[in-house]
Amino acid sequence: MLENEYQLEYFKENGFIRKICKKCGSAFWTLDPNREICGDAPCEPYQFIGNPIFTKHSLTEMREAYLSFFERHGHTRINRYPVAARWRDDIYLTIASIADFQPFVTSGVCPPPANPLTISQPCIRLNDLDNVGRSGRHFTCFEMMAHHAFNTDEKPIYWKDRCLELCSGFIESLGGNVFDLTYKENPWFGGGNAGPSVEVLMGGLEVATLVFMNLSRKNSGKPPVSIDGKDYYEMPLRIVDTGYGLERFTWASCGTPTAYDAVFPEMIPRILTAAGMEDRLENPEVERILGLNAKFAGLMDIRGEKIRDLRQQVADATNISVAKLEEIIVPMETVYALCDHTRCLAYMLGDLIVPSNVREGYLARLVLRRSIRMMQDLNMDDDLGDLVVSQMKTIGLANFEQDEDIVRHIINREVEKYDTTIERGTRTVQRVGQTYVKKNEPVPLAELITLYDSHGIPVDLMGKILKDTGAEFEIPDDFDSQIADMHSENETEKPVSPLAKYAERIAKIPETRKSFYERPADMEFDATVLDIFDNYVVLDATLFYPEGGGQPSDTGMLVTKSTMVRVDEVVKWENVILHKVRENTLKRGDRVKGVLDEDRRWALMRHHSATHMVLRAAKEVLGPHVHQAGSQLSTDVARLDIRHYTHITPEELKQMETIANRLVMENLPTMVKIENRVKAEQKFGFALYQGGVPPGKDIRVVQMGAEVQACAGTHCQSTGEIGPIKILKLEHIQDGVERIEFAAGFAALDAMQHIQSLLNTSADTLSVQTENLPGSVDRFFTEWKDQRKEIEKLRAKIAELELSRIEGINIGGVEVVIKQIDVSRKELVTVAGKIAERGGVTVLITTADGLGVVASSGTGKIHAGKLVGEVCAELGGKGGGKENLAQGAGADPSAVGKALLKAESFIRAEFNS
């Protein structure tokens, strides 16, 4: 497949020979005429452990060596992107360096930030989560060093030959011997693209991959190339997409037993000391075992049953039992995994991800809770927040937007939540286990996933609890990896627009001029009707804003000399705006005057602008991690959903309202610019994308003070035009998301006047001044509570009197009381309970606080739940409960007599059965 793509001048000119691996059958290129295997796992074991193949470099030194090398060879160094992929709407985390430039640069919509460029991009992949720590080489968080070139026919940069030349040159710059290097052919495809690629192998380790992306599933009209049974076509853009593993290069330069030893030279001793495992430090026997484990792991896929095979191979090679081996190696694997996870959390939280139960927050919580569990397994005397902050400091605090104290606070909150989750979730797991024991069925995997997803129970603890219940179950070794995979991509399907059926027709209509951007304060305009179909009118230009991004559309009128039609809704399809009218009496070519509903436009514009101000205030009060999770506007009120790790306090809400209004009073100008997407991202960062990711090469950037967003809505021309902002309500709508409801302008004035009216009415009712309301309400409430206690005491005495006066009937040798007693349900329960305690049966009905029924039974012959159900059915209601006590309610008070008779007949029938 693509064999001709590898017949390169670089290989020929430098003496490389194409060979076929005698073990796996793959084609590879080498300078060694005697080499017979490709150099990849599992064909060749690691050769560099204890025998480094590069000059020794720390992680920081290796990164700088790489970036400097490519800078010297004509590449522009660019800063890393965040690990939260907020410029993407399909993935949550940055999984590769090329992801930084997808989809807009790779599709040719936007130019790259530099060409060619070099970057060292932190990436997070959780698909091998369960292998981290075990294999010696897997990480959740790793840095992909890369050099990229974006080639077009008009502007070629470099292609395969130069890329290979640079790769060999970099390896030589590290002291590597190119004679030991192999380039293995391995065509790449994924995400609708494909191309030839080579794996770069040294010492049995894949250190880099060089992909030459030049094919796409999109038909370009050129002859197709078949890959994996699918047709691909030449792309106009040819992309050099490389990935060099920073951690792997560092490992190969140090020759340590595992990659973790090379990457975490400071964190490993700290964790070992905190876990009381200092004896593992610089222990030759432990190092020998770990090195063998890494070598054997490099030759196999260690998921599932393979982990047991790996244990046996290492045990055989070291002449110790598997049990003894696991005593040595399992705690070390946990230490390694904790080192990795804390670095992963440093990037996640440092790059402003907030743990939650959705999106990237879910993945952060998954890693965080695994870390908590690992610390518990190691009996560590250390703080998770301190470990993560220590990793941030090693990386460099300047690399992160989040403050270290907030990171600690977030982690402390998550640890508290975890403890509560375990306590509550344990009972749930026990119930599930008992249910499947009764069914005599194993607990299915789907149920186990639900227990984790909905209740947050770690898989190992889940297994222990289920085992104690006697339930049968099977938890896959890669359970956490499967969970992560389920949540790694945004698979939400966009709803089909009702306009889709008009797509062909709309495609023939010229783009609508968006006059609402040019003249946002104007309320009238002239335009020409371009098309009319169903109840839609298309104009050549419009001031009517179409619905989008949480902002409802404008409404108003379209007027001609002879007719007038009402515009109820405005929508957009690509670049054409459609006005939905009630009665379509217009025709093509008509000149119309558009007249907006002015009060509505101003209310929506004020609320949209106020949303920016409230968001800015939230960031100033709560921290830079605050990110918009959604918004919705109306003329009366607006709401803003934000991501935050804890509940917002009343004091914080007050500060936010003050800051938002201060920004209004500063009368800051609204600056709107159409900017190149890449330049805007470089200038303002990815906080631009608060309301989603707009398409296109250029984006509309709205700046109001320090708040800058890519935003398509209508805005006031200065913050002063917003008017007062009043926060009305705060809701905790889901874990990690707070909803702020507020009003602006005249809507805020109406809200404040309404609140004042309520205060005045309340003050009049209590005959006090408004400023004395809090004290008066407190006094009245205290008196009310005292009186209620007295009433409860009196009711209890009444219930005792009723109990002493009640005479029952004898049915089957049991005292049976069937009566209407008009006391509260609470007293009914007390009376019924006491009769049941002495072995009796009761049915008591009250109309004191609604039509209520209480039944009790002190004998096994009568089930109170069934009894109350029969009685309530007679009353037109429902009821149920336990065997000894049950309650219900009715709807028909006139049926009380019949219900009491029904109770007696049911009890007699039960005794006679």
Curated annotation (Swiss-Prot):
It is an enzyme of class 6 (ligase). NCBIfam families: A-tRNA_syn_arch, alaS. Its main location: cytoplasm. Zn(2+) binds at residues 608, 612, 711, 715. Disulfide bonds: none annotated. Belongs to the class-II aminoacyl-tRNA synthetase family. GO terms for cellular component: cytoplasm. Its EC number is 6.1.1.7. This is Alanine--tRNA ligase. It comes from Methanocorpusculum labreanum (strain ATCC 43576 / DSM 4855 / Z). Keywords: Aminoacyl-tRNA synthetase, ATP-binding, Cytoplasm, Ligase, Metal-binding, Nucleotide-binding, Protein biosynthesis, RNA-binding, tRNA-binding, Zinc. InterPro entries: aa-tRNA-synth_II/BPL/LPL, Ala-tRNA-lgiase_IIc, Ala-tRNA-ligase_IIc_anticod-bd, Ala-tRNA-synth_IIc_core, Ala-tRNA-synth_IIc_N, Ala-tRNA_lgiase_arc, Ala-tRNA_ligase, DHHA1_dom. It catalyses: tRNA(Ala) + L-alanine + ATP = L-alanyl-tRNA(Ala) + AMP + diphosphate. Its cofactor is Zn(2+). Catalyzes the attachment of alanine to tRNA(Ala) in a two-step reaction: alanine is first activated by ATP to form Ala-AMP and then transferred to the acceptor end of tRNA(Ala). Also edits incorrectly charged Ser-tRNA(Ala) and Gly-tRNA(Ala) via its editing domain. Pfam families: DHHA1, tRNA-synt_2c, tRNA_SAD. Consists of three domains; the N-terminal catalytic domain, the editing domain and the C-terminal C-Ala domain. The editing domain removes incorrectly charged amino acids, while the C-Ala domain, along with tRNA(Ala), serves as a bridge to cooperatively bring together the editing and aminoacylation centers thus stimulating deacylation of misacylated tRNAs. GO terms for molecular function: alanine-tRNA ligase activity; aminoacyl-tRNA deacylase activity; ATP binding; tRNA binding; zinc ion binding. GO terms for biological process: alanyl-tRNA aminoacylation. It is found in: Cytoplasm.
